Design a protein with these regions (language model features):
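Sec-dependent signal peptide recognition
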Residues: 1-8
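N-terminal pre-ligand scaffold of iron-sulfur
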Residues: 19-93, 107-108, 121-138
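C-terminal motif of bacterial Sec signal peptides marking the signal peptidase cleavage site
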Residues: 13-16
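Short cysteine-rich clusters marking metal-coordination/redox-active sites
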Residues: 78, 98-99
């Protein structure tokens, strides 16, 4: 009888771990670097600015300069059905990003979902800013 309980417990642990990994944005290496005077990031010159950088991450990057002047970066891959790699688009004004496939919306301040069906935030990357360069890495 103990063996049956142990087997059931192992099955429950295995299936619960698999469910946690479902719907996760894949891990890919990200190493974006640009000089601060690069025209691709000129939208970050003032607070509230955001830019889209293609060719990095799963579906590209969004870099946002928050009102407190901190920089944050997110993968554009929506956390709703990430296996589709649906790239979120910037809304106007640049306070949210929308998943065109599901209609979900995400805050650019911290990547959290602000409109269903999203339940998980956008994947966030580390941003490093020096006197001359901005880097987005993981």
């Amino acid at each position: 009888m103990k063996a049956i309980y142990a087997l059931l417990l192992i099955c429950m642990v295995i299936t619960s771990c698999n469910k946690d990994k479902e719907g996760r944005i894949p891990e890919v290496p990200v190493n974006f670097r640009a000089p601060l005077n690069d025209p691709r990031i000129s939208g970050l010159n003032s607070a509230g600015g955001a830019v889209v950088i293609k060719g990095y991450g799963v579906a590209g990057l969004i870099i946002y300069r928050r009102p407190d002047l901190a920089y944050v970066a997110f993968d554009r891959c929506s956390s709703v059905n990430p296996e589709q790699s649906c790239a979120v688009t910037l809304d106007d004004p640049n306070l949210t990003a929308t998943d065109p496939c599901s209609g979900a919306k995400f805050s650019l301040y911290d990547g959290t979902p602000v409109k269903a069906p999203a339940k998980r935030p956008l994947k966030q990357y580390q941003v490093i800013v020096t006197n001359f360069e901005i880097s987005v890495i993981n």
